[in-house]
Amino acid sequence: MALRVLGVTQNLRTYMRGVEIIKRYKSALTVKKTLLNIPATQVTQLDNGLRVASEDSGASTATVGLWIDAGSRSENDRNNGVAHFLEHMAFKGTDKRSQTDLELEVENMGAHLNAYTSREQTVFYAKCLSKDVPKAVEILADIIQNSQLGESEIARERSVILREMQEVESNLQEVVFD
């Protein structure tokens, strides 16, 4: 009985949070004005075929990234896991920057560099001050084009990825949705 009451209480809290969000908007007009103030996304294509999506929110921070249509869905028995592996290896250094130099440069900008792999894509991105977008783009380009794949880093990341795979395999929800 106590568990059932606890479950109802949790559901009620979730519902009430939703009601509070709706109350913030006093009318449909307010919702419409809010939606109209979302910056438009402009998509352009470079001569090399690369598509660039951009929004100018006027904010002092920005997120820039590279979304690559290469996730686990594109893999087969021979190259299974390669997108995830390359995502892990990307931040181990480049021809121009060691791993430490890369970390310090990003940290000194006050930026955040990250990546993830899904079934559909592999993503590399940086969150930074708007004024630092050109530098963040240069760093991302260096990582994508010039990553070093050292033997010791490969061995270390291999064990990290194998451990992550074990965690995913033990999570029923991850297995079902994969």
Q: What does each model-found stretch correspond to?
A:
Residues 2-101, 125-128, 138:
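His/Glu-rich zincin catalytic helix
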